[in-house]
Amino acid sequence: MFELVERANTTNIGVELDASHLFWQQMDPVAVVRHLRELVVHAAAKDVRVNPTAAIQGVLDNRFRRLDQSEPRVNLGGNEWANAWPVDAAWDFVAVGRGHDAQYWAEFLSALYEVDPKMMVNIEHEDTSLGPIEGLELAASVLKEAAQLAGIAIDELPG
């Protein structure tokens, strides 16, 4: 990211840091926030659970199955379609708190707070085992607990 900013010779490039994509790559989102510092301008709270299958398939599990045109599919735009996720995937997107506990998320929020005390964090919910409201409620509850553990007041939203 630093190289991109340097080559572009600009100061208006920033990172929307999505912890989930770092988790499945076995990266530490807290360390990444502290490394990128002021380049992080927004964050997404989405969790990942690495499953035992990762020991055999690795995190680059490529057992996704292309859906046949006769199967119900989700169009991603143009001629791009979502594939079928492996039944026993190496990792899964899960609601915040189902992959990493509130203490971990407290560290994540603290790192973001060090960069910008008014940093906005949005919840991304892709846990297919939970309904849309249930997943958001769980994530919000874990993040509120994490903020409390980190000593970050969330009583007022900026702006």
Regions found by a protein language model. Name each.
Residues 1-17, 21-159:
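Histidine-acidic metal/acid-base catalytic patches
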